[in-house]
């Protein structure tokens, strides 16, 4: 085992990560157990409550297992049909979009407790208001960050990586589109979790996710481009969004027409218009190279037009 550590630094790196995470978790547990009376471990017999918790946790696990399976198997498919460079491009695209999506995730994290609290207090009108508006503003926030990156992606990648793997920019652009769908799903998922009856929505969304790998395999078998894999994922994410909206309508009374207009049609119309205006504006002004000032200018133009549209809407 020790010889493996000397010969393969990657194994040593993995072991050290496990040790660090385990030690960190143990220290958290020890501190909380000593300082906080309410966090001490004790065994209490609440059979019905335990059963309900296990049921909800089980459905949540079922909904997330397909995602983990897809991540691993898609990497395997890309390695089977293409060179490792394509897999490297996929890794870069996931890294970039995860960083971009973090901004909208922070907003949704702050809204999540309010959605759950509103349902618990039977304030369903406020809960639906929060779901729709957090979806809309998540799109806007993600858009402000994404637009400058989207417009000068090749230049940014060349500055960052110098030698950019083939397909990287295509993968990132398609994955960014999927990020908008993912940020729309989160408030809906919180609303469904709040009411507790998550069996059917999580079952069908999990089933939809399971179709990603077989469909991708068929496309690659017929020698389609690797970008097809990402397009399939986006289409499935759209299907999952439809499933979430449908069950939110049934279980928590979300108006489909109101949601489609306020969280989809209107925000994305604004996004399309502002993208066009930003492109036309920046094509007529002098902005040096690919640096900070270009990104700042694009973000400023986007933010200004978003504020104008929201003021008119109010």
What is each PLM-predicted segment?
Residues 1, 6-7, 11, 32, ...:
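Membrane-interface junctions at transmembrane-helix termini in multi-pass inner-membrane proteins
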Residues 1-34, 56, 206-211, 225-247, ...:
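Hydrophobic alpha-helical transmembrane segments
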Residues 2-6, 68-99, 117-118, 151-164, ...:
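Helix-terminus/linker motif at the lipid-water interface of multi-pass membrane proteins
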Residues 6-14, 28-72, 110, 114, ...:
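Interhelical loop/hinge segments that connect adjacent transmembrane helices in multipass membrane
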Residues 10-15, 49-56, 77-98, 125-130, ...:
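Interfacial/gating helices of multi-pass transporter permease domains
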Residues 36-37, 93, 97-135, 142, ...:
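Helix-loop junctions and terminal segments of transmembrane helices
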Residues 128-183, 210-221, 272, 276-279:
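Alpha-helical transmembrane segments of multi-pass membrane transport and lipid-handling proteins
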Residues 304-311:
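Conserved small/polar residues in nucleotide/adenosyl-binding loops
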